[in-house]
Design a protein with these regions (language model features):
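Histidine-centered metal-chelating micro-motifs
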Residues: 47-49, 68, 87-89, 93-99, ...
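Short histidine-centered beta-strand/loop micro-motifs
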Residues: 26-27, 48-54, 71-72, 80-81, ...
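Short acidic-glycine-tyrosine-enriched beta hairpin
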Residues: 74-92, 193-209
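A short glycine-rich, His/Asp/Glu-containing loop-to-beta-strand
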Residues: 11-50, 56, 135-174, 178-179, ...
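A generic "binding-loop/recognition-motif" signal
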Residues: 55, 66, 95-96, 177, ...
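Glycine- and acidic-residue-biased ligand/ion/polar-headgroup-sensing regions
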Residues: 55-68, 72-73, 177-193
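Double-stranded beta-helix
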Residues: 2-7, 72-77, 96-144, 213-234
Length: 234
């Protein structure tokens, strides 16, 4: 079974820490067991106090804006990274972290994914994957960037990539992981399976065995963030 979700201004909810969330694929909306996916907006001058999550790894993909990402290292020291559009952040379970937007005028938009599993991913990973650090591979549909590999996220069970579909090209296949999704970062595509328009901010959520066919019928490239997770082996 496949599910489609899209961001809408009236679906964003203000949270107690000051950010706005728009829930996409979750356990309630898509019967997802491994992923909880949310669009998140941090308005200007929003500082989110450092904290930990003890039930999941947390993944950020920066869509728009610039911010600061605080991460605690295994030796107890803290490192603050600059984050920008296209950067990916992987926070392993129980890692102290905080994300802030110090801009006077620019909001920080991110895709937030909680990955639920038993066990513990490697806490010694760096945690921040800058967009310009990921090599780009050519593909029949355009290009592929492997942003999340076992070395970058500390687990064999999660894979993350940024895909670019060129005009006139098609990305097609079958979900091979337990859960998988595509999120349209920019551009507009058409899903033939299931049939639907995929505008920027739309998520297509799949389970193992589901077929997908995403066509770029426009004149501009389409960029997708794709994440998949299998049964935990940690």
């Amino acid at each position: 079974m496949q599910y489609l979700f899209s961001q809408a201004e009236d679906r964003f909810q203000l949270r107690e820490w000051g950010g706005y969330l728009c829930f996409l694929a979750t356990a309630d909306s898509a019967a997802a067991r491994k992923f909880g996916v949310t669009a998140i907006v941090r308005m200007d001058q929003l500082i989110h106090d450092p904290h930990v999550h003890d039930d999941s790894d947390e993944i950020f993909y920066v869509l728009r804006g610039h911010g600061k990402q605080l991460l605690r290292n295994p030796d107890g020291t803290d490192t603050v990274y600059d984050i920008a559009p296209g950067d990916t952040v992987y926070l392993t379970k129980n890692r102290w972290h905080g994300t802030s937007n110090f801009s006077d005028s620019e909001q920080l938009d991110m895709l937030l994914i909680n990955y639920f599993y038993d066990g513990q991913s490697n806490p010694a990973i760096r945690g921040v994957v800058p967009a310009d650090s990921v090599p780009c591979e050519q593909a029949v549909f355009g290009s592929r960037e492997w942003v999340l590999t076992p070395e970058r996220c500390g687990t064999e069970n999660v894979r993350g990539e940024v895909l670019t579909i060129l005009p006139g090209k098609t990305l097609a296949g079958k979900a091979e992981a337990a859960e998988m999704f595509f999120f349209v970062v920019s551009g507009e595509a058409v899903s033939a399976v299931p049939e639907a328009r995929l505008a920027a901010g739309t998520q297509l959520f799949l389970f193992r065995g589901d077929e997908y066919r995403i066509e770029n019928r426009g004149e501009q490239a389409v960029r997708l963030f794709c994440l998949s997770a299998d049964d935990a082996q940690n």
